[in-house]
């Protein structure tokens, strides 16, 4: 979605290749609220690099100065010319041009990025519970939360992160226990028959909202989506 937005193409035109070290030589995995913050940032930077390189190639095709080439909504144009090129037109055209060394490889770029500054999402939550005074059984009756995750790229996914992490947090607080036999040292909870996970019928409908305050630590203003509720 990030690449499609910046390159001005449909999401269907973007193919993500993962787990191939011939293409991506280093990666740290998807954890610790880093996917959109780290990958989104390098996709943004790579998109800008690709657009600038593409402008140079388009200038050769149009036979104009690089400064005269403009890019908007996935289309390249030049001042005073009616002809336009989209990404696919330009890719085909680039195979017919005698490209200088700085444009070798055509419409390909490699981009790395190191992020050393931490970001801190934040939020506020309120939970209403009903407690059976005789048994001590706790039922979660209502849960509401407002989270600041920085810029929200995809609200549906962020809501899903919030719901999933709330369920995870409630499960850890109320049901999940890794019990060890004191004599043998063996775990008693060897299966999901003994290790209690939260289920949908034990949880209320979550009331969630987002408060966007952009992070100054990266160009997209990203923080993270799943840390607060957990």
Locate predicted features.
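C-terminal catalytic domains of large/alpha subunits in multi-subunit enzymes
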Residues: 2-230
